[in-house]
């Protein structure tokens, strides 16, 4: 399953209720979010209850509702916080790089490293998020668009420098590259074999660059 089959860039985010992603951070809120990631990954989002999350976080069930409106709000908050952290890390990773191919390589490595270093987060992102209709109604497409924008900018810069084919649409190419990384992350979760997810990044980028390079 590709993320763009369930999270189109031009999706209109129908936020019927405000997310708690922008609530003041704190150790207890962070602990609840971490517990939610682990609980949703281990039990499955639909099978998990807020009480399960509270138990894993070591707090009363009522305490969860001081920070999050519902189980759905927890799921949206996981996505938004993780995407914001990913954006910050990705921007920092390419801030000192001018070379477009190397920027794509660093972005790919960083994306797979984040998921590869936190298997439960990867399960939530690759599996659980995509099964929630309410999440699909509420998630912010802006974060995903900004995240893919880093790849799109590198591709557009490569075209201006004559490194990449001019007939490629940067937005479409960014989706293709991200889609390949997304699929590798899903395969990593489903595989019985244990291996470094980050190590796959270079293979994906090399394959992409071979098709994108100017002839």
Model regions and ranges:
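Amphipathic alpha-helical segments used for helix-helix packing
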Residues: 115-135, 187
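Short hydrophobic clusters on alpha-helical segments that form packing/core surfaces
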Residues: 32, 36-40, 111, 181, ...
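Amphipathic C-terminal alpha-helical segment
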Residues: 113-117, 153, 157, 177-195, ...
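Helix-turn-helix
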Residues: 31, 39-73, 77
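Hydrophobic alpha-helical connector segments
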Residues: 77, 91-120, 170, 174-177
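Amphipathic alpha-helical packing segments from all-alpha helical-bundle domains
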Residues: 84-88, 135-161, 171-175, 179, ...
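Hydrophobic alpha-helical segments that form the core
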Residues: 4-6, 168-187, 199-209
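N-terminal intrinsically disordered/low-complexity leader segments
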Residues: 1-27, 34, 38, 215
